[in-house]
Curated annotation (Swiss-Prot):
Region annotation Disordered: where it falls in the sequence: 80-100, 115-167, 468-541
PANTHER family named among the record's database cross-references: PROTEIN PLASTID TRANSCRIPTIONALLY ACTIVE 12, CHLOROPLASTIC
Subcellular location: Plastid, Chloroplast stroma; Nucleus
Gene that this polypeptide is encoded by: PTAC12
The name this protein goes by in its record: Protein PLASTID TRANSCRIPTIONALLY ACTIVE 12, chloroplastic
Feature: compositional bias, Polar residues: 144-154, 508-519
Ranges annotated as biased composition (Acidic residues): 471-480, 490-502
Assembly: Component of the plastid-encoded plastid RNA polymerase (PEP) complex.
Disulfide bonds: none
Transit peptide region: 1-58
Predominant localisation class: plastid
Length: 555
């Protein structure tokens, strides 16, 4: 190894002996001490680190210094007993459960390094202030360190004339940075967290206890609840004649609506108007479902507090005005010797069958909802109906009663089907139907023109194509020759007969046209071939062959 000798700055009064060997700058061989020695001198603090002249450092190779490898502290253990697998596991290596450092996830190395940090060295000279004066003991030292780093190696200007310039040499800049880091890390300032004063609502919300949906301190006041007529969702179209508003305008009493109204009467919820809307009924149903267990627990606590006689006397009309407190029961026990159970049985002997059904419901094993147990008789009938044998509550008794079906959905009453269809012309009476049929029959009789019967029935028969095309053309030539030989009067009669046969043939082929129009199509008047032009001949001819034949004849 090589041991280094740091030349220190020469102060007045120190010896200036030069050691053997080439030294370019005046140096003083002393043992290496920290630069903090001079910072501890109050009258020398201002002169520290102000010199700019640097000296050459003498390094001497010394092989006498060596280290013993056995002095290196081994790891605390090479294997450990893993509680998960129940076997000895190596602490390092390929089979180790803990992987090497290069495989650690992000942030693990920093946490391990922080856990291995040594305790701060040194002893505190002052008394702790417990956070009242944070950092006061280190304030001067921090300023000095920052000034030292800022003016590192600077030359002093306040030296006397003729004196040698003072020299300040620092081993390295990294040491100064490490000292600054150490000074920052060694002292931790603890700030006591401010305790939040939670309101009752915030505390209930944080602990999960039942609490309102909106903070009561921040909730807006809704004012007085409006009546049913003032609420916008009960609006209805004004009728032409003033009519009495019927009870059928309300929603039909079902379980949710009746329970919502009962909950509003007992103060569990608040509804706007005389009757709950669909939304309010749905919300009340949800609330009733969620908090039923809590209500049952509250009822059980009440039963234990006031005693069973006072609790169950609510459903015994004969005991309404009787004192059922624990003191009265104890007094009765002292007088007669009847304990609480005997008095309870005696009370239930005065209970009617109807009161028992209300109290227990249909099944004694069912834990009844206390709200349902305390509902009025009319509310219970609205939900479950009255007597199932002779129903009196959920049915309309008068068969001629006109029911107003207008409900909160704002649709108009369902009209009668027959008058509605007759009004829109979809349905007509039987008399109107017969009248229209007679009119149509007369119109058909007037429009149809009867065709005289042909003498020869075969003349009206449709030619299915017995002859070939050449034979037909030969027959036509013969007809032309015959026509030329006949006189004019006979020709006219034959033309008329041909026209009638042609009309009859068209009627047989297309009877629907005659039925719809009522008139047979008249045959086109054939002009004489001498007067036909080329265009008319093309239009008149049925196909190209006929046109060419006609064209040859005209030429």
């Amino acid at each position: 190894m090589a041991s280094c000798y740091n030349p220190w700055r020469l102060f007045p009064g120190m010896s200036t002996a030069v050691p053997a060997g080439p030294v370019t700058a005046p140096a003083h061989s002393r043992t290496c001490k920290s630069s903090k020695v001079f910072s501890a001198l109050p009258h020398r603090r201002g002169l520290l680190f102000l010199g700019t002249r640097r000296a050459r450092i003498k390094c001497v190779k010394d092989d006498s210094l060596h280290f013993d490898p056995s002095k290196i502290e081994p790891p605390p253990y090479s294997s450990y007993f893993d509680s998960t697998s129940g076997q000895l596991e190596p602490a390092s290596g390929a089979r180790a459960s803990i992987p090497g450092k290069e495989y650690w996830p992000e942030g693990t190395a920093a946490r391990v390094r922080a856990a291995r940090a040594p305790a701060p060295v040194g002893e505190s000279a002052g008394m702790p202030s417990f956070g009242t004066k944070p950092g006061s003991r280190r304030r001067g030292y921090k300023e000095q360190v920052t000034s030292a780093s800022g003016t590192e190696g600077a030359q002093t200007d306040d030296r006397k004339d003729g004196d040698e310039p003072d020299v300040a040499i620092i081993g390295s800049g990294d040491d100064a940075l490490e000292e600054i880091k150490d000074s920052v890390d060694e002292y931790v300032i603890y700030e006591t967290p401010e305790e939040e004063e939670l309101s009752e609502y915030d505390m209930d919300k944080m602990m999960g206890r039942p609490h309102p949906f909106i903070d009561p301190a921040k909730a807006m006041s809704l004012g007085e609840p409006k009546t049913s007529e003032e609420l916008w969702w009960h609006w209805r179209r004004k009728s032409q004649e003033e009519e009495m508003w019927s009870r059928w305008q309300r929603r039909r009493p079902d379980v949710d609506t009746v329970f919502a109204k009962a909950m509003a009467e007992t103060g569990q919820i608040k509804i706007f108007g005389d009757h709950p809307s669909r939304t309010e009924a749905a919300l009340a149903k949800t609330r009733r479902h969620l908090y039923k267990e809590e209500r049952l627990e509250a009822e059980q606590r009440r039963l234990e507090e006031i005693g069973p006689i006072a609790y169950y006397s609510e459903w015994v009309e004969a005991y309404k005005n009787k004192d059922t407190s624990r003191e009265a029961i104890q007094k009765h026990f002292e007088e007669t010797g009847e304990d609480e159970n005997v008095q309870l049985i005696k009370m239930f002997q005065h209970q009617t069958a109807g009161e028992y059904r209300i109290m227990m419901g249909t099944d004694v094993r069912i834990q009844r909802d206390p709200l349902a147990m305390r509902m009025r008789e009319d509310q219970i009938k609205q939900i479950w109906g009255g007597d199932p044998v002779y129903p009196t509550i959920n049915y309309v008794q008068d068969p001629d009663e006109v029911i107003d079906y207008r409900g909160p959905e704002f649709h108009e009453p369902t009209p009668e089907v027959v008058p509605y269809l007759m009004e829109h012309g979809i349905m007509i009476t039987k008399e109107e139907l017969y009248a229209r049929l007679n009119e149509e029959r007369e119109d058909v009789n007037q429009d149809i023109t009867y065709i005289p019967e042909a003498k020869d029935p075969m003349a009206t028969a449709i030619d299915i194509g017995e002859h070939s095309y050449n034979e037909d053309s030969d027959d036509e030539d013969e007809d032309v020759d015959k026509a030329a030989a006949q006189p004019q009067s006979l020709e006219d009669e034959e033309d008329d007969r041909d026209d009638v046969a042609e009309v009859e043939e068209k009627v047989n082929q297309n009877w629907s046209a005659l039925k719809s129009t009522g008139q047979a199509e008249k045959p086109k008047e054939k002009s004489k071939k001498d007067e036909m032009t080329l265009k008319e001949a093309i239009d008149d001819s049925e196909n190209l062959t006929d046109f060419l034949m006609d064209f040859e004849e005209t030429e």
